[in-house]
Regions:
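Electropositive polyanion-binding surfaces
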Residues: 1-355
């Protein structure tokens, strides 16, 4: 990612995404297996990748100081963070640095952050303002982490850094740009989410009451979740409970017209998955469609042929991934903490002890 400021105060964002189609051909064994898997699966000590590691971690990955093929987005925002233009084309890129969120946040909080990081904060905050303006909501959910510890594991939570939300806004912006291009071209696949139902909202208000979180009757849930601090335990619990309002997400493919009921209610915008083709199958297809439409070229036939089946393939992959991740968390939650294995839990009752 690279961000510059134009002469009239506009922001120009260059956002590079791995070009998986430069390495994977339609119908080859890697492509067929990727369709079977759908997404990358994550475990504490390993991952089951969507693509072979020689691609996902090396040849196709945008590693620092390496020249790689990419889909390069150029998105222009006006000085108040509104998108005014977007296009994508194939390019060769060289990544200059790879920073963790903590490293990026430390640099932003320092005296002289590199220009892109300084502008990332400004653009991210403007995009958060635009999200509030259109009635969208992004959950800053504490991350549940499993870390190796000696011979065992520890389970904990980590509140996200502010830079994570700003970076997420750039990804969301790119997904919205992709959705706009596909809707204009009347062909593509969108990420969808239905509005929250009234019963779920009523239950969530009961949770807020139990946690002693003030939620005025006139306040909508997007305004509530924005005021919550994930570093506070009661707010973290409320944010976790609020995920019930974000259920029902899916995909909607279309061609030859504009689909109905294809909005993403949580974002209050049209939206597409496009930024993670190395770990999510659908993003490769969204990218190919946007590259073709940006160049006023026909969408490749192999993309058209796969569109109808992608929503169900991705739904099955997401269900499998959720079962897998939940099983791992359940296993860790019922196990003893690291360093406590084999230690008896003794309760005395009169002359008897139980362990």
């Amino acid at each position: 990612m690279h961000i510059t400021r134009g002469p009239n105060g506009e922001f120009v964002i260059s956002y590079a995404i791995a070009d998986v189609a430069a390495f994977v051909s339609p119908g080859d064994p890697i492509d067929l297996e990727a369709h079977r898997r759908g997404v990358t699966l994550y475990a504490p000590d390993c991952r089951t990748p969507l693509h072979p590691p020689v691609l996902s971690e090396r040849a196709a990955s945008l590693l620092p100081n390496e020249v790689r093929p990419a889909l390069l987005w150029t998105i222009t925002l006006n000085p108040r963070g509104q998108m005014v233009a977007a296009e994508v084309a194939r390019a060769l890129v060289r990544s200059r640095a790879q920073l963790s969120y903590r490293q990026a946040q430390a640099e932003i909080d320092g005296i002289t952050p590199r220009p892109t990081l300084g502008l990332l904060k400004l653009v991210g905050q403007w995009r958060e303002f635009r999200e509030r303006e259109r009635g969208g909501a992004s959950l800053k959910i504490p991350q549940q982490e499993i870390q190796p510890h000696g011979d065992g594991w520890t389970l904990g939570f980590r509140a996200p850094e502010p830079v994570e939300a700003w970076n997420a806004q750039i990804s969301l912006l790119t997904g919205m740009a992709a959705a706009h291009i596909m809707l204009y071209g009347q062909v593509g696949i969108l990420r969808t989410m239905p509005p929250a139902d009234l019963d779920s909202l009523r239950r969530l208000r009961q949770v807020a009451k139990a946690l002693r979180i003030v939620w005025p009757p006139e306040m909508d849930y997007p305004d509530l979740v924005r005021m919550l601090n994930p570093a506070w335990p009661d707010h973290a619990a409320m944010l976790s409970a609020a995920t019930v309002l974000f259920r029902g997400a899916g995909y909607r493919s279309f061609s030859g017209g504009i689909p109905e009921d294809a909005d993403h209610a949580a974002l209050a915008s049209d939206y597409a998955h496009i930024t993670a083709p190395l770990r999510r199958l659908v993003d490769r297809y969204s990218g190919e469609i946007c590259v073709a439409l940006s160049a006023d070229q026909p969408v490749p036939a192999w993309v058209f042929h796969a569109l109808d089946g992608l929503p169900e393939q991705m739904a099955a992959a997401e269900r499998r991934a959720k079962r897998y991740e939940r099983a791992i968390i359940d296993l860790l939650e019922v196990g003893p903490p690291a360093g406590q294995q084999g230690r008896p839990d003794v309760h005395r009752h009169g002359d008897r002890s139980q362990s």
